[in-house]
Amino acid sequence: MIYIHKKIKNPIKDGIEIGEEIKRNVGRASLIIFITSILERDKLKQVFDGMKQHIPLDNLIGCSTGGTFSGKDYIKEDGVLILAFDEYYKSAISCEKVDREAEYVGKKIADKIKTCIRDKYPKLDIDDNFLGFVFFDWNVDSEQEILDVLGRELTIPIIGGTAADDGSFDKFFQIYKGEVVKDCCVFGVVGGKLKFDLIYGHGYEPTDIYARVTKAEGKVVYELDGKPAYQRYLEMLSEYTKLPMDIIKKYFYRDLRRLDFYLVHPLGFMDINGNYITAFLERVEENTLVFRRDILEGSFLVLMKTDIEKQVKSIVDELKKAEDFENPLIFINECYGREVLKNSMFREFEEDILKYFLNFYKAGKKVEEYVIEDNCIGWLSYGETIAKDLIRFHNNLSFTGVIFELSQSSNINWREELKNFNFEDDEIEVIVNLINKQLTAKELLQLTNLSQTKLYHILNKLEKEGIIKSVSGKPKLYYIDNIKEILQKTHEKIEHENMVKKIKRKKLLRLL
């Protein structure tokens, strides 16, 4: 598994380089997650055209984003974040237009995934772990409902989010097999001997100000405490901040480009586990509040609070789970709104900022002391998704993610280590290029400095000795079935040969 985080300057050239890097490091990737802040379709197509010169895109899924990051390195525009899984993993992908009820769409996706896995891999290992990646469209507005179906039907952990753009909410899209799609649910799974753990957080805490939902239907709340919902929300903000209503109204919501009361003090509720979570407000219609999730009549909504330290600390605390991994890689889906709060790159400059908002940045501990390592990569979304065990949750103003254990074999210097198994240099060159890959003779010629005659001689020799195997076809594919098992047999063969030589040496010495 590898990741690529890159600013695209020359689409065709950069696409070719990306394709080369994926092919060189993982071969025919079983699954490619492709997240991009390239919002111009023609430019993105050129990147894909470049990649296709070296790799197929039939297992590539993803979406647009408002920005990507690797550690503290952010790319806001024309960037790509790619996660490519080695070809020995099992995978399947699906894409469905969300033009019918969520139950139908979710079940159709799940059925396609199950059928594909069953047909491609008739025999699954008992220790195979599967992980799902899902990418939604903001305009569809049925993320939670579809996630519930996917989680129920597939019973695997799922991570992902809603496609985003530059804050304009009119340029986002999804990606399926290297093609731009809209109004869909794009889904993929990857599995095998894959160690991972999921993370989630939001960085908000409840205040002691709350209101009862006295009239609601689905995602629309009409009344709080018997008053028009929007009016009561403004009152709650005024009560907590001690600011007059005209100031609250002026700075209530400002198009996801500047700090406002909605981002600092969203409404929230208590989940079934007793944890407080945010309830994302999509819009205000007259005096009603329209949320991105169903709000139950009779429940309570609480005013939430946060500051810069809580926002940063929330993600750092979750990343402590990576301490249980020897060589972790963390992939994060983070709400665009969180970056507006904590990253000036995503905010418009204000000369005269409201004094109350300055308190947001007065952290008790320097934010710089919370270190985000370079092995933490991610993208900015308009909604964050997680399904783990019985928890199936799509939210906003939050983050979800997955911690992977990277294979320790990626740190092995194969060219040096294989010399200890009595392989010749030219044989080592072929073996190194076939580890975790399936390649044709033509591809091996491009990757090695061997002549065609020499290469075919080595391929025949290694195949005869059982070091490599091949799949008949046009062209023929060469691969290594199990590198550990092969090296173990080679080691035992060397030990046996050494023992025979040792016995013969002793026999000769006795005769002298």
Swiss-Prot record:
PANTHER family: BLR0328 PROTEIN. It comes from Methanocaldococcus jannaschii (strain ATCC 43067 / DSM 2661 / JAL-1 / JCM 10045 / NBRC 100440). SMART domains: FIST, FIST_C. Gene3D superfamilies: Winged helix-like DNA-binding domain superfamily/Winged helix DNA-binding domain. InterPro entries: ArsR-like_HTH (IPR011991), FIST_C (IPR019494), FIST_domain_N (IPR013702), Tscrpt_reg_TrmB_N (IPR002831), WH-like_DNA-bd_sf (IPR036388), WH_DNA-bd_sf (IPR036390). This is Uncharacterized protein MJ1623.
